[in-house]
Design a protein with these regions (language model features):
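Conserved active-site segments centered on acidic
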Residues: 2-93
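Phosphate-binding/catalytic loops
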Residues: 2-7, 13, 96, 102-148
């Protein structure tokens, strides 16, 4: 069902994809935290989320142990996520695609050959109210503090 004020099918769930480089640190953390927020607001079934990486190097791997440790510290647990690469059809299937850094955003826009998903692709920091950086730093090559 569409209407003039909200020109999308509101009977279908809103689908959000979080994207980082390898889908083992930032994007799965965003997905885990977001799913918890959705569940707490009782929006299950109305909002769906997933995560993916720009590269498939870690395909099938769980999130980085250091990220899981940091999430656990704040009360979050991994519901069994496994890394997967971004697919071209993700650009059509998701209503919002959230990139963690400029490189992710650039690569997502390159995948969008005809420009139809351009308005769906946004930076994660667009939603940050207390984090003033323009991108979420990749903690992979750093120490444990980078995962906090």
């Amino acid at each position: 069902m569409e209407n003039e004020l909200f020109p999308m099918d509101v009977s279908a769930p809103c689908r959000i994809l979080f994207v980082c480089l390898g889908n083992i640190c930032r994007s799965p953390a965003a997905e885990i935290i977001f799913k918890t927020m959705v569940r707490k607001q009782r929006l299950d079934g109305r909002i769906e989320s997933d995560s993916a990486g720009m590269i498939g190097y870690h395909r099938g791997c769980p999130p980085d142990a250091r990220m899981l440790e940091a999430l656990k510290k704040y009360g979050y647990s991994n519901p069994g996520l496994k890394s997967r690469p971004v697919r071209k059809n993700d650009l059509e299937e998701f209503d919002l695609i959230v990139g963690m850094d400029r490189e992710n955003l650039r690569d997502l826009k390159k995948m969008d050959k005809n420009g139809l998903a351009e308005r769906k692709i946004v930076p994660m920091c667009f939603f940050a109210t207390h984090f003033l950086d323009e991108e979420v730093p990749d903690p992979y090559y750093g120490d444990r503090e980078g995962f906090e």
